[in-house]
Amino acid sequence: MAGESFPFTSSTLRALRLQREWLDWEDRRRAAAQQCRRHRDLPCPQAQLLRPRRSCRDPAVHNALFSGDLQQLQILFQDEDAANMIVETVSNQLAWSAEQGFWVLTPKTKQTAPLTIAVARGYTDCARHLILQGAELDARIGGRAALHEACAQAHPDCVRLLLTFGAKANVSSEEGMTPLHLCTSPESLQCAKLLLEAGASVNVASQESEVTPLHVAAARGLEQHVALYLQNGADVALRTSQGETALNAACAGAEGPGSSRQHEAAARQLLEAGADPQAAGRKRHTPLHNACANGCGGLAELLLRHGASPGVTNGAGHTPMDCALQAVQDAPNWEPEVLFAALLDYGAQPVHPEMLKHCANFPRALEVLLNAYPCVPSCDPWVEAVLPELWQEHEAFYSSALSMENQPRQLQHLARLAVRAQLGSHCRQAAAQLPLPPLLRDYLLLGVEGRIQ
């Protein structure tokens, strides 16, 4: 019996070999983990897990992470392997089914990391525990690192924690965005300051769109962010893949007069920092085109004061005045006459009579445009578009316009046009300096009177 051996099957021998290899690997992993902990404060780009992360769909783990239950987290996450697991969530989302011909609920799996969940919800103590257990600071499970989510959700305490433990301030997401790109709300200002103090690059561009943090802040009207980036060396001349500057982004992001105050403040800072008001993108759309298309009179006047040209055309052949006329119907709760008067005062040519139909139901704006002609042109292009109730409310103006169709205007009006022609694009600035009575100055600048004289 002593010379005999127990008969092992081939599958048993293979299982024993795999188990021996697993034990050897586990010994190497533990040794590497101990060495990593000893050098945690030193930059170590090779400090990655040696084997694939395990996935977790355990509801208990999900509840602890998403609710910020620190006591439960301390029980569930006691080693590096647990701290670096992949957390999977499944949610039903509407997706179009070409085969069935209608929208159906389709399960979609999302992956993220425990540390990312904690910092995205502002659970600083939970995040600290995960980091102390060995959670990778710059892991991009699901496309973003923890620092991206902390900035996107504006949690400065979590941002400070991550940076203190060595998170990279310029870590890039799968979309090529840095954490500074994701400081997109007023509340994220402190996050942006912390990133810059940690060495974040203010001029880094995303991979595909090539937007910089300055583009993002300007587009959202974040005037304090814009000021911060400019103080830290942001370049106002950098362009996106579409050729847009930060000033273009600020003017394009001002969606209507109601949101233009913040964007106007951001644009003012950019102009004072040397931004070119004439810089056009690939479609030859200038900042002034964008401001006029959004109906932002104050923003347009700011650009005009800094040298924007009201006569330049974009790729479609439209001037800023054309863009403003097309925006009248899209933004009814504004005063288009202010924008039209500013464009005319800075040298814009009178619009083609066919374009007057766009502001037929805005009598004050229509009056400004009609007073830019030596005589009132044919009213046929716009008279049919006037709403009956509006005609009744402003009958005095509409009747006066019809009565003056192709008729000689007063000598006073012709003199006004002659003075305006002489002053050219400096009409508004010159009128402010001339010693004129207020009523005469308003008349020179096409002030609204309520009727065509």
From Swiss-Prot:
Extract the CDD domains matched here: SOCS_ASB_like (cd03716)
Q: Which UniProt keywords apply?
A: ANK repeat, Repeat, Ubl conjugation pathway
For this protein, the record's Gene3D superfamilies field holds: Ankyrin repeat-containing domain, SOCS box
User: Biological process GO annotation list?
Assistant: intracellular signal transduction; protein ubiquitination
In this chain the ANK repeats are located at 56-85, 110-139, 142-171, 175-204, 209-238, 242-279, 283-312
Q: Which Pfam families match?
A: Ank (PF00023), Ank_2 (PF12796), Ank_5 (PF13857), SOCS_box (PF07525)
Q: In which pathway does it act?
A: Protein modification; protein ubiquitination
Name residues in a coiled coil: none
- Please verify whether the record's keywords include Repeat: yes
Per UniProt, residues of the SOCS box domain are 397-453
* Family as reported in the entry's similarity comment: Belongs to the ankyrin SOCS box (ASB) family.
Task performed by this protein: May be a substrate-recognition component of a SCF-like ECS (Elongin-Cullin-SOCS-box protein) E3 ubiquitin-protein ligase complex which mediates the ubiquitination and subsequent proteasomal degradation of target proteins.
What does the record's free text say on domains? The SOCS box domain mediates the interaction with the Elongin BC complex, an adapter module in different E3 ubiquitin-protein ligase complexes.
What is the name listed in the Swiss-Prot or TrEMBL entry for this protein? Answer: Ankyrin repeat and SOCS box protein 16
Source organism per entry reads Mus musculus (Mouse)
Give the gene name: Asb16
